[in-house]
């Protein structure tokens, strides 16, 4: 997911400075010399990659699944709303978070910041991309309460010990 986050944030940051046909291209400035794509790019944010079909165990390839979800959210919600959700939901993630955990954290973040106004759009994107279960099925796990996520994250956090100094 980390590569996908990085690609999304770079694409979102530079989107307003690029012509429309290049907005979903990451690294187009570098890829000119070796990419045969038109337009040239290292990776694209508007791919049709889905989970688990396109998961290959390579961080950049797999990151394209995540960045495509985030870019689709940006297209649906607008850059300002999507960027706030993407950045804020990081506080709910742990080093072991998976795609589904992060999608649920986005839903929870929207519930906290926007009273859930965008939950249906968020859920639809992640269901369509194969990351969240289809809500019409028996398993309806999309969206956890903030307290539940915080408690789970606290359980996973390593315990810290503080050495106490002895006073004289």
Feature names for model-found ranges:
Residues 1-160:
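Zinc-dependent metallohydrolase catalytic domains
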């Amino acid at each position: 997911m980390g590569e996908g986050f990085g690609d999304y944030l770079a694409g979102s940051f530079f989107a307003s400075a690029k012509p429309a046909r290049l907005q979903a291209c990451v690294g187009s400035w570098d890829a000119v010399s070796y990419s045969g794509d038109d337009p040239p790019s290292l990776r694209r944010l508007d791919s049709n990659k889905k989970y688990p079909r396109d998961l290959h165990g390579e961080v950049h390839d797999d990151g394209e699944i995540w960045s495509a979800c985030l870019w689709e959210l940006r297209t649906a919600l607008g850059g300002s709303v999507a960027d706030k959700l993407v950045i804020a939901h990081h506080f709910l993630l742990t080093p072991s978070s998976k795609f589904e955990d992060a999608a649920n954290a986005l839903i929870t973040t929207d519930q906290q910041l926007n009273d859930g106004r965008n939950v249906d759009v968020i859920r639809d994107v992640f269901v369509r991309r194969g990351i969240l279960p289809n809500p019409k099925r028996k398993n309806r796990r999309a969206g956890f309460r903030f307290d539940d996520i915080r408690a789970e994250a606290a359980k996973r956090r390593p315990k810290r010990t503080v050495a106490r100094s002895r006073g004289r």
